Amino acid sequence: MFNLRDSEKLFIPFITAGDPLPDISVELAISLQNAGASALEIGVPYTDPLADGPVIQRASKRALENGMNIVKAIELGGKMKKNGVHIPIILFTYYNPVLQLEKEYFFALLRENDIDGLLVPDLPLEESALLQMTCKKENIAYISLVAPTSEDRLKIITEQACGFVYCVSSLGVTGVRSEFDPSVYSFIRKVKEFSSVPVAVGFGISNRKQVDGMNEISDGVVVGSALVKKIEELKTKLVNPGTRADALLEFEEYAKTFGRLYSVK
């Protein structure tokens, strides 16, 4: 099971599998690794993404139109590993796509494609025991989400945590935010007190100032919507073989602003 404890401040990016195209997702993963990513979340596109804001919803729509599904997303993770991605890969999926597969087949796919972690944002703690137990048996980190509303269950969640704890910075859906409620900072400190694994903060991280602020009180950040939005902006250049290399380099340089390779020029 992967361990991020010895890393510097964590930079955990999120991309939607198959957006804008599956092969380009592999190249984006390599760019993110080059940009200093500690681990990578790949999101399974879903028709009813309750936790996702408009940016990731649009990415899911594009990926679904390209035929992406949970099986292909897992296989895409395996392709990333075969093409030189050595950082941990975490599958981010809603529970319904998992239910569509036989449990044995699902975990065989994860194992065969060298997937390191699993994050299911809409599965309540009380219903996750079987999935957590199977993940432990398969040496896959089951990533726990904690939100300000789950404070009363904080001790239980952090005791069961593997890999890292994903601390939700704000209530509502994912998306870029200009500022956070002041109460979130005391909540993150409380999560740190309870957790024996690193605590990474996500939902709304969109600039270096926010990264620096969260790094002061946590072990790092998860960045999703800002990166997915950049992919959307670069889509035309990414799908064009003649401009792809330049677009990937631009994406990589942008991603560096969130991680340990950031430098003021």
Swiss-Prot record:
Q: Which domain of life is it from?
A: Bacteria
Gene Ontology terms for molecular function: tryptophan synthase activity
Catalysed reaction equations from the record:
(1S,2R)-1-C-(indol-3-yl)glycerol 3-phosphate + L-serine = D-glyceraldehyde 3-phosphate + L-tryptophan + H2O
Any GO CC annotation of this UniProt entry? cytosol
Q: Does the keyword Amino-acid biosynthesis apply?
A: yes
Active site, UniProt feature: E41, D52
Pathway(s) it belongs to: Amino-acid biosynthesis; L-tryptophan biosynthesis; L-tryptophan from chorismate: step 5/5
- Gene3D superfamilies from the entry? Aldolase class I
Instruction: Give the UniProt keywords, A-Z.
Output: Amino-acid biosynthesis, Aromatic amino acid biosynthesis, Lyase, Tryptophan biosynthesis
Entry's EC annotation: 4.2.1.20
Q: What InterPro entries does the record point to?
A: Aldolase_TIM, RibuloseP-bd_barrel, Trp_synthase_alpha_AS, Trp_synthase_suA
Kindly indicate whether the keyword Amino-acid biosynthesis belongs to this entry.
yes
Top enzyme class, one word, equals lyase
- Similarity comment: Belongs to the TrpA family.
- Quaternary context: Tetramer of two alpha and two beta chains.
The record's function comment reads: The alpha subunit is responsible for the aldol cleavage of indoleglycerol phosphate to indole and glyceraldehyde 3-phosphate.
HAMAP family recorded for this chain? Trp_synth_alpha
**Under which name does UniProt file this protein?**
Tryptophan synthase alpha chain
Supply the source organism for this entry: Bacillus velezensis (strain DSM 23117 / BGSC 10A6 / LMG 26770 / FZB42)
Encoding gene, per UniProt annotation:
trpA
